[in-house]
């Protein structure tokens, strides 16, 4: 922003005041335009970030339904494992194919939220909006890490059966260890389901708020 000297010499106080007024008005207009352009840029930044966040949250909500289905199916399998292991403990022969310790999990995405923080869009959002997005993504991250930890534990749980090749080759101690581990994993999944229900409520609230904003 440049301020140029007067083209004509200033001879009177009136000329000086007029020139000062011209400079002041010019600076005010320039600063106002600059602020308006910057404000418009910030609004566009927030608008684009929110659109990306809503798309990502909607996609995560769809993935949530699949993850919830897999967790429920895995708990059913664990319940069967526990019953079969109890029968095995009492000497009943089992088909190895009926026992299993494995399940699927697809982590929720947080790319749009990280991008909004990195490009500064979050800093121009309203505080309640920031809090809403923050809680969703914090909950997602916690659930992702918890689920992946359970996946790791469950993957190791069936190692004894894998080594034995046949359930009848398992020792009483190995059977008891498998029983306890299966029960522990099932309890962990029960807690995970409760936490996931809280995330689902957040997704629903976010969707309702978005619908209310749409004209």
How would you describe each model-predicted region?
Residues 1-14, 35-215:
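Long, hydrophobic alpha-helical segments that serve as membrane-spanning/inserting helices
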Residues 10-25:
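N-terminal signal-anchor/signal peptide hydrophobic helix marking the start
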Residues 21-28, 32, 36:
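Residues within alpha-helical transmembrane segments of multi-pass membrane proteins, especially transporters
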């Amino acid at each position: 922003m440049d301020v140029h000297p007067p083209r004509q010499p200033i001879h009177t106080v009136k000329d000086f005041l007029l020139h000062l007024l011209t400079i002041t008005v010019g600076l005010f207009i320039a600063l106002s335009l600059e602020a308006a352009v910057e404000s418009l840029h910030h609004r566009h930044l927030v608008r684009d970030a929110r659109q990306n966040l809503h798309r990502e949250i909607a996609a995560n909500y769809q993935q949530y339904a699949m993850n919830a289905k897999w967790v429920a199916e895995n708990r059913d399998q664990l319940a069967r494992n526990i019953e079969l292991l109890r029968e095995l403990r009492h000497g009943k022969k089992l088909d190895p194919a009926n026992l299993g310790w494995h399940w699927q999990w697809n982590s929720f995405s947080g790319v749009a939220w990280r991008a909004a923080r990195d490009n500064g869009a979050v800093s121009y959002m309203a505080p309640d909006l920031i809090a809403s997005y923050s809680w969703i993504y914090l909950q997602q991250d916690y659930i992702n890490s918890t689920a992946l930890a359970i996946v790791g534990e469950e993957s190791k749980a069936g190692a004894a059966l894998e080594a034995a090749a046949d359930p009848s080759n398992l020792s009483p101690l190995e059977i008891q260890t498998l029983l306890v581990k299966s029960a522990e994993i099932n309890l962990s999944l029960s807690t995970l389901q409760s936490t996931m229900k809280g995330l689902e409520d957040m997704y629903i609230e976010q969707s309702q708020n978005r619908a209310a904003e749409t004209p």
